[in-house]
Every structure is written in structure tokens, then in C-alpha cells.
């Protein structure tokens, strides 16, 4: 079980200022979380193979292939600004 002093220490390390009410709230919440983790530690998982994910994940996106587009000027003309044959976009990074 976790006590208020441990919550204060964690708050100090995280540079958080907690009110007494928040200290009490987090003491209760963290205590509940740790109790639940303790219940999980009691489970027999010796026959469960290690996994990285609970379900199989597959890539559902298409392969990234270059496709030529015949009307390049139509695309460029729809841009708010262009410079030659390129889109002109606002600068977002400093030159530093």
C-alpha cells in the first residue's frame, strides 16, 4: 500500500504541487492501482507465451508506389502559392 508521504515524494520528483485533497485522492487512486497490479502478479502465466501485442496486427495500407500524373499543371494551379514547378509553403522552422 502507498501512503501520503510516498505520494508527496513522487510529486516532489515530478515537480508537482499538490493540495492536501489531491494528496489524499492520489494516495487512494495509486493504492487501488497497486492492489490491482498485485492481483495480476498472482496469476499463473507460466503457459502463456510472451507477446508484444494482445492481437495480431497487419498492415492494411497499400504499397507506396510512384504513379505518374498527366496533368501536373492542374495540381499546381490549385495551390495557393507556387514557385516554378513546386508548391510554396510557409516557413515553419527558424533558421537558427
UniProtKB/Swiss-Prot annotation:
- State the InterPro entries in the record: Asp/Glu-ADT_sf_sub_c, GatC
Has UniProt tagged this entry with the keyword ATP-binding? yes
- Say if the entry is tagged with keyword Transmembrane: no
Catalysis: reaction(s): L-glutamyl-tRNA(Gln) + L-glutamine + ATP + H2O = L-glutaminyl-tRNA(Gln) + L-glutamate + ADP + phosphate + H(+); L-aspartyl-tRNA(Asn) + L-glutamine + ATP + H2O = L-asparaginyl-tRNA(Asn) + L-glutamate + ADP + phosphate + 2 H(+)
**Broad enzyme group:** ligase
- What's one Pfam family the UniProt record gives for this protein? GatC
What is the role of this chain? Answer: Allows the formation of correctly charged Asn-tRNA(Asn) or Gln-tRNA(Gln) through the transamidation of misacylated Asp-tRNA(Asn) or Glu-tRNA(Gln) in organisms which lack either or both of asparaginyl-tRNA or glutaminyl-tRNA synthetases. The reaction takes place in the presence of glutamine and ATP through an activated phospho-Asp-tRNA(Asn) or phospho-Glu-tRNA(Gln).
Which NCBIfam families would you find in this protein's record? gatC
Summarize subunit and interaction data from the UniProt record for this chain: Heterotrimer of A, B and C subunits.
The name under which this protein is listed is Aspartyl/glutamyl-tRNA(Asn/Gln) amidotransferase subunit C
* Gene that this polypeptide is encoded by: gatC
